[in-house]
Amino acid sequence: MKIEILHFDKFKFDHEEQLHDIYIKRISQFRNIITDIKTVKINNKGIENRLVKKNANECFVSLDEKGEHFSTEDLKVFLFNNNFKNLKFIVGSTDGIQKGILEKSNKVISLSRMTLTHSFALIILLEQIYRSATIVSNHPYHRV
């Protein structure tokens, strides 16, 4: 499975970018279950174009505070028990995600009921993807 995280804004602080890089590197160690992971800075038009051209192997998941609440276990099941070869997560800008993009997404999930900065949402998502991969791989990172 390939995972692509589409986001609108750049990191404001060096430590945010460092955390991003750490989790991308950690996730990349699990090539047997996640063949590729990357983050792509994009605009609304770029996302709309991708949504119009999506195929049956792609799943677009928007992050929105009003979305379905997922536990770590829910995310793990969603990531590794689906038929999609390409998962594309959309992390909104300061203004959130446009209604049309939310409506065209396959799923809308919430990381928290609280409002998060786009960079924190992106880092939390990466950490949870990493945690899910460690659970599936019986890696000691996740302790129950």
Residue ranges of predicted features:
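N-terminal beta1-alpha1 ligand-phosphate binding loop
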Residues: 1-27
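Short hydrophobic segments within beta-strands
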Residues: 6-8, 63, 90
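Catalytic-core regions built around general acid/base machinery
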Residues: 23-26, 77-82, 104
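Short glycine-rich anion-binding loops that position phosphate/pyrophosphate groups of nucleotides
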Residues: 65-68, 93-96, 114
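Ser/Thr/Gly-rich flexible loops in soluble cytosolic domains mediating phosphotransfer, phosphorylation
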Residues: 84-104
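Structured adenosyl-cofactor binding patch, chiefly the S-adenosyl-L-methionine
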Residues: 99-143
